[in-house]
Amino acid sequence: VVIHLAAQAGVRYSLENPHAYVESNLVGFANVLEACRHAHTPHLVYASTSSAYGANTRMPFSEHHGADHPLQFYAATKRGGEALSHSYAALFSLPTTCLRFFTVYGPWGRPDMAALKFADAIAHGRAIEVYGHGRMSRDFTYVADVVEAVTRLLPLAPTGQPVHAHDTLSPAAPWRVVNSAGGAPVALDLFI
């Protein structure tokens, strides 16, 4: 089993250096896919992002919603990774689960993420920069919940065959997308 969590992350930096995202998130991931293909990996778990939903306005986000209009380079490269992994699943029977993580926070989190930026500002008595008057909502996911999602999915490699009559998460290729979220969007002003 291979768990691929490495990536060039972050929306803002992708605007400054899109090549870093292409190299890491597409070229780097293509190298992982090739290695998994040749090693006959029984299950690849790939860290994707809720940003893949892009311009989708249907809430709550569902794996069945379109993800064909990413709005940033970061999201486009992660969505591209999903497409690459689907091709490998279809062509080489590489069982792959793409996990779309939603705003992960917790210990050792990225310093550019809202939770750590807010905590740092509060700890140092600085004002918190809030966009949209704090009314926008995010589905924040604690890092331990991400670990649990990955751990639970490890033994459940997609087969390419529907598990039951209403299963649309297991297409003909042994590949699937699974949302990994807290399950309860929180308004930013309440989160702060």
List where the protein language model places each region.
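Glycine-rich "substrate-gating" loop/helix at the edge of Rossmann-like oxidoreductase active sites
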Residues: L71-Y74, F101-D112, G132-A144, G182-A184
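SDR active-site strand-loop-helix element
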Residues: V2-Q8, L44-S50, L99-F101
